[in-house]
């Protein structure tokens, strides 16, 4: 098993796996220069709904605030060519993930190359696509929805044999959960800074449980953000190029900032999207 906080217990699978989005072939990193090809020119002529959508997305980005709810654009009934052109135009950005919702529904999320613009595909328990949206938001609403029913407390038994620091860590987590209010700064517990035995980590995993959301951010390195079974408690692990954990933390917060689009991202993405529309769709 790989070292770090969030390791599935022996014999169990991971609670959630980052997976290719939707029932279609996996999205690949696509260069925007596709739009300059002859194939794209013909597709753009056919796909007027996409041409109409892009300025609406830019307008939404112009007024979006990081702390406000996002805006959804339903493309479920768009023709296949339009949806493919949207995929090509938006590309694949740094953050992707999945959220398990009620009734077996899964929200599969991919940020565009324009930060703060997300492609959200909802699939049923059999993997069939049931809805397809573009969302302008700091983080998709499905993430908060999936976590809304988690308990705001933790319970556990006595310390196991071989425990070193798990009990004070659990006390700290429980205290921070009880005190946390929306908008409070994140409280970070860094496991890299003090010793935790394997018994500590196993007991901590069992006490917190598995949550319904997993996100991966790929920028200069890889960061995996996993919701635990306690509200506002997240495992945040940073990996190097060898897929080795270099920083292992828990964050008590609404959603870790590493996965969230910032205020300036919306303005930058608005400008970029308008440039694309002017160059290829106008």
Swiss-Prot record:
InterPro entries given in the database record: HupH_C_sf, HupH_Hydgase_express_prot_C
Keyword Manganese attributed: no
Gene3D superfamilies in the record: HupH hydrogenase expression protein, C-terminal domain
Keyword Methyltransferase set for record: no
Keywords of this entry: Nickel
Domain of life: Bacteria
General function of this protein: Not known. Could enhance the incorporation of nickel to the hydrogenase.
Family: Belongs to the HupH/HyaF family.
Protein's UniProt name: Hydrogenase expression/formation protein HupH
Species, as recorded: Rhizobium leguminosarum bv. viciae
Lineage, broadest ranks: Bacteria, Pseudomonadati, Pseudomonadota, Alphaproteobacteria, Hyphomicrobiales
């Amino acid at each position: 098993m790989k070292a770090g906080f969030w390791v599935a217990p022996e014999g169990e699978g991971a609670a959630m796996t980052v997976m290719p989005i939707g029932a279609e072939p996996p999205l690949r990193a696509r260069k925007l220069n596709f739009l300059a090809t002859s194939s794209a020119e013909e597709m753009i002529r056919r796909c007027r709904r996409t041409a109409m959508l892009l300025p609406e997305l830019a307008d939404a980005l112009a007024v979006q605030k990081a702390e406000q709810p996002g805006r959804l654009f339903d493309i479920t009934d768009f023709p296949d060519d339009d949806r493919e052109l949207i995929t090509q135009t938006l590309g694949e950005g740094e953050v992707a993930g999945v959220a398990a919702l009620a009734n077996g529904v899964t929200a599969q999320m991919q940020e565009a190359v324009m930060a703060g613009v997300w492609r959200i595909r909802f699939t049923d328990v059999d993997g069939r696509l049931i809805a397809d949206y573009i969302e302008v938001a700091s983080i998709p609403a499905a993430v908060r929805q999936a976590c809304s029913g988690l308990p705001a407390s933790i319970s556990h038994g006595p310390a196991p044999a071989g425990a070193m620091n798990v009990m004070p860590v659990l006390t700290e987590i429980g205290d921070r959960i009880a005190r946390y209010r929306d908008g409070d700064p994140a409280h970070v517990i860094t496991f890299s800074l003090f010793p935790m035995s394997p018994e500590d980590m196993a007991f901590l995993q069992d006490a917190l449980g598995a949550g319904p959301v997993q996100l991966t951010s790929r920028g200069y390195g890889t960061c995996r953000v996993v919701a635990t079974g306690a509200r506002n408690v997240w495992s945040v692990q940073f990996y190097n190029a060898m897929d080795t954990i270099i920083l292992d933390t828990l964050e008590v917060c609404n959603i870790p900032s590493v996965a969230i689009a910032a205020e300036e991202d919306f303005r930058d993405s608005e400008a970029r999207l308008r440039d694309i529309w002017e160059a290829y769709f106008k």
